[in-house]
């Protein structure tokens, strides 16, 4: 894949078989999971949970960078709860999301500034911008 003066920092590789009722494994062996459909009684996780976990982790990293740009540190007890809805639409399926963000002890305006900065720089947030209805909520 060619890039325009971009430097690839990391490439994740997974092999998935069986779709929502299959398995997914990473090339380094660190990820080896069973997949199941949401709401089924089968063991395993689903793409929506994986997306939520990845986005939460990435967003926390982006908040750290945004806080650093403001010359402050994130509170020790910060967290992100990400909800991903699988939505049935007239033309198939789509996703919508809510990121509920806790930054205890920070002034509300400062916390909102960090969240806004992270939403602009987080690779997940950038990838879904204008395609997935997303709410960023300070809790």
Language-model-derived ranges and their functions:
Residues 1-53, 60-139:
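Extended beta-strand/beta-hairpin segments
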